[in-house]
Design a protein with these regions (language model features):
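Active-site hotspot residues in diverse enzymes, especially metal/ion-binding acidic/histidine motifs
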Residues: 1-155
Length: 155
């Protein structure tokens, strides 16, 4: 199994942990866009998506829609509502990628290295900033809680 396949399997495991069904079909054409439906807690993941390097991010994005609870509607008349749902899907997708990196001891010295490694498009770079800032905040908070519980001193 290569690194991309490992990440995809890990994402499928995350979906399963959150009672999200991931359906695939080997016959889907490479341009069939992956989708998700919150009510069914289901993701339709296209294993033939081209370019192949985008497959993990598209799966993480669709899982992100369900985890965020935002319903995406292609018939939505209010573009800002749809953009918010897409942004939430993007943010959670990046947070999932960061969690994968953390659990697999993968580190990057810069955000740009993360962006390049996962082929994150320019349209999602603001969410990379949001996700990394949130992750750093959560790590600092956890460290403070551990320090307080072990020493009784606030850092």
């Amino acid at each position: 199994m290569n690194k991309m396949e490992d990440l995809i399997e890990w994402l499928k495991g995350v979906a399963k942990e959150h009672n999200i069904t991931v359906l695939t079909e080997s016959q889907w054409p490479s341009d069939w866009v992956p989708q998700s439906q919150i009510e069914l807690r289901c993701v339709w993941y296209n294993p033939n998506w081209f370019p192949a390097c985008e497959r993990p991010l598209t799966l993480a994005h669709e899982i992100g829609h369900i985890l965020s609870g935002d319903e995406v509607s292609l018939s939505c008349n209010y573009c800002s509502v749809n953009e918010k749902a897409e942004s939430d899907g993007d943010l959670i997708a990046i947070m999932l990628l960061l969690d994968y990196c953390r659990t697999h001891d993968i580190t990057f010295e810069t955000k740009q290295q993360l962006i390049e490694a996962f082929r994150i498009p320019i349209s999602m770079t603001e969410n990379v900033d949001r996700a990394t800032n949130f992750t750093l905040f959560a790590m600092r908070k956890k460290y403070r809680e551990l320090a307080i519980s072990s020493t009784g001193v606030f850092i």
